[in-house]
Structure formats: C-alpha cells, structure tokens
Curated annotation (Swiss-Prot):
This is Ras-related protein RABD2a. GO terms for molecular function: GTP binding; GTPase activity. The gene is RABD2A. One of its GO terms (cellular component) is plant-type vacuole. Transmembrane segments: none annotated. It comes from Arabidopsis thaliana (Mouse-ear cress). It is found in: Golgi apparatus, trans-Golgi network membrane; Golgi apparatus membrane. A lipid is attached at residues 200-201 (S-geranylgeranyl cysteine). Does not interact with GC5.
Amino acid sequence: MNPEYDYLFKLLLIGDSGVGKSCLLLRFSDDSYVESYISTIGVDFKIRTVEQDGKTIKLQIWDTAGQERFRTITSSYYRGAHGIIIVYDVTDEESFNNVKQWLSEIDRYASDNVNKLLVGNKSDLTENRAIPYETAKAFADEIGIPFMETSAKDATNVEQAFMAMSASIKERMASQPAGNNARPPTVQIRGQPVAQKNGCCST
C-alpha cells in the first residue's frame, strides 16, 4: 500500500472531438480554462489527489482523442479504467447522438463493472443549446447511468462530476471482497502481480 494515498482510481474521458474533454480535465486538475484548444492527439492524462470520507484518493484522469483515426490507440485504455465519463456538447446534436456509439465502445473494451457517467458539457452556451436537459436525463435514466451537465468555462458542476464518479467507484470498491480494490494500482491497471517489473511504463 502506498502511504501517500488510500486508493488510486483511473478515470477515462471519452466522446466526440471538440466536446470539451480536455477543457473539463484542465478545469478539474488545474482550475484553469483556455478559450482555444488543440485537439488531443492519442491520449493525455493528469493527476489530482482528493479527500473523500477521510480517505485520500489519487485520480489518474486520461483524456482521449475523439477522432476516429485514434480509436485503435485509445481503445486499449478502456481496460484498466475504474470509471468512464462520456462527454457530449449540449450545443451539438451529433455529439449527443454518438453517445450510443461510445457506450458500445465501453461494452466492447472496458471491464463489466466499470462506473459510467454521462456529461453534457458547455451548459453556459444557453442560446446555442441543441439538447434539452430533460432529453439527456431521460436517456441516461433509461440506460441506468448518472447524468450531469457541466461548463468547463465557468466551472459549473465540473468538480461535482469528478467527485461523484470518485465516490461511486469508492462505494463499489467497498462492496467488493477485501483485496479486490484499487490498492495497489498495478493490480487494477495492469492486471499483473505487484512484484511484476516494467509493467507500469504505459499506464
């Protein structure tokens, strides 16, 4: 067990290109926002350590490229994820319609019990809204996953989204048999014995 934290959770941000995944990550990890962004190439990640219920939780958050040409690269990152956040743009109907495709990617590549959260980003752009809150909420309820709208620009619900995901993973871990949690991280992320060497360079 690492004395610096009680749990390490690997989170994955997925969704169409341009929906604001990188902006959400930047807002949560660094509390900053940039108006112009450069599309993520392959994958990027940031780490933030949080306190929840008296436990120290290290969140390793992976930001994936939304473009089709990177799909093969990013699909390999699903396997070790404890939680996956599916992001769409509330002003972009196509990005919402494609959520089903992203969910099928999760079914194909991620572990069966992975925690999921649907996030509608750019909620600050009220005049350009294409997807009503009620529509997305009904869809999320139908498939049985939590839903939240966020704005990386004005920081609305960004902290809450990541903390809610962390709490749901922690709750799931607590209900599992002892030893089957996120400590140490090499077990969860790589599926290899702790003593295994050179297994964490790509995580």
